[in-house]
């Protein structure tokens, strides 16, 4: 059986998050950036299974980090399962985008679980075991939001049916009130399976890179959001700026 260390990258001390926030909670998942939230149906309903799909370097992780920042502002606990980030690199990235979450991390409102599997034997049985461990942790965790960044690596060593079963279990957990965000590369599944994956999820955000003028920009398409306050189908063009994070590019400028 595979061994996966689900010990978080911080001590998880207890305190009232409202003491850090200084304001009342808001029961919707937002990025903490009003300009971006307007484009994603005024925020994503809590209790949703959210798919963030895109190729390499399209801003999937950056978007989840904005969600983490918004979650802290809205009195929500977050568990982040990352296949790439260490505690140090996570905090450094957040700081580089002026998303200061160090106090929340120190108090345990954000917990980072490292999925760096050193000297790990990649087998379908082992990967299925890891997926089961993750889903059980999410089910019994006191976190309001779970982020899996990314699911792609697991799809390479296990069957697509096993991943679909994982997503179905995740959807059942969301029906009980938890919110789960999953990032995934578009190439991870066949077209038929990808259609099934998208249908399971309550929200589907598609991240792309587009050449506009003489430069590439990132584009977020809101494909669907069940229970959204506003209609979906919006396209958001943005760049990632050091010291600022996601910066919306007006359509008129993006087309120049």
Regions found by a protein language model. Name each.
Residues 1-21, 228-256:
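C-terminal regions of RecA-like/P-loop NTPase motor modules
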Residues 55-118:
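Conserved P-loop
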Residues 31-43:
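Pre-Walker A adenine-sensing motif
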Residues 77, 109, 142-145, 176-184:
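Loop/turn-to-beta-strand initiation segments
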Residues 115-175:
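Phosphate-binding/switch loop-helix module in NTP-utilizing enzymes
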Residues 184-245:
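Phosphate-binding/switch region of NTP-binding enzymes
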Residues 15-34:
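N-terminal pre-Walker A segment at the start of P-loop NTPase domains
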Residues 50-53:
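Short hydrophobic/aromatic beta-strand immediately N-terminal to the Walker A/P-loop
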